[in-house]
Amino acid sequence: MAKLTVVYWRDIPAQVIVKAGRQTAKRQLTERFEKAIDRAAMRAKLRDTDSYLAEWRRSDPADCGDDLEAVATAEAERLEAAYDEARLAALVASGGVDSV
């Protein structure tokens, strides 16, 4: 059974990983997520490397379909739609922490 994992910086998603055995499909989210993470880190005053790196986490692996590429693409598209500019701006304003 394949497993789906999302990599986050605090509560901002950055990457989707789908893995089954030795096979892996990965999708990095678009540049707007990377920019939001950088802005949120600056707002949270996490300027040194160790503080910044300590905030990365992975979601618990979730069971998913066996077409790794399709699952990775679908989840990346879902996250792109779920995190519109307003939601990312709110996350930046809160230092990357989702207040919902």
Locations of the language-model features?
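Short, charged/polar N-terminal "headpieces" of proteins
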Residues: 1-27
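Mid-chain, well-packed structural core segment of small domains
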Residues: 54-73
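C-terminal charged interaction modules
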Residues: 70-100
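Solvent-exposed, flexible loop/coil residues
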Residues: 10, 16, 33, 37, ...
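Acidic, aromatic-enriched beta-alpha/helix-loop junctions
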Residues: 21-58
